[in-house]
Amino acid sequence: MTARRKQALAEAGHRWIVSLLLSLLAACASGVLYGLAFPPARLQWLAWVALVPLLLAVRRGSLSAALLTAWVFTVVSSYVTGAWFPRAVSDYFGQGPAMGLAAFFAISTLMGGPGVLAFTAAYRWVARRARPS
C-alpha cells in the first residue's frame, strides 16, 4: 500500500469520526430541546424545532450511525424529562446509582427505542429515494 493511499484512508477515517461526533452532538441538542418541551420546563414551542438537528444528522452517514444517533436522542430526551428516575430506582431498591442508571438506560431504550429507530430507518429510506438523481 502506498503512502498516499494510507494517508487517504486515515483522512477518511478522521472524517467519519468527526461526522459521527457531529451527529451525536446534534442528537444531544435535539434531545435536550425536545425534553424541554415537556413538563417541568413546559416550553412547548421547542417541540416544533427540536427535531431539526436530529433529522439533519440521520440523513448523512451509514444506517448504523443514524440508528446510534437516534438512540442517543431517545436516551437524552428521556433523561431531560425523567432525571428523577435513576435516583428513585436506586433508592427504592436500595442499590447504588449505577443500578438506577442501568435501569434508566434499559427502560428508556425499551420504551422509546423501537419507535424512534423505526422512524429513523423509514426517514432515511424516504430521504434517499426522494433525492434527485
What are these regions (language model features)?
Residues 2-133:
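Membrane-embedded alpha-helical bundles of multi-pass enzymes
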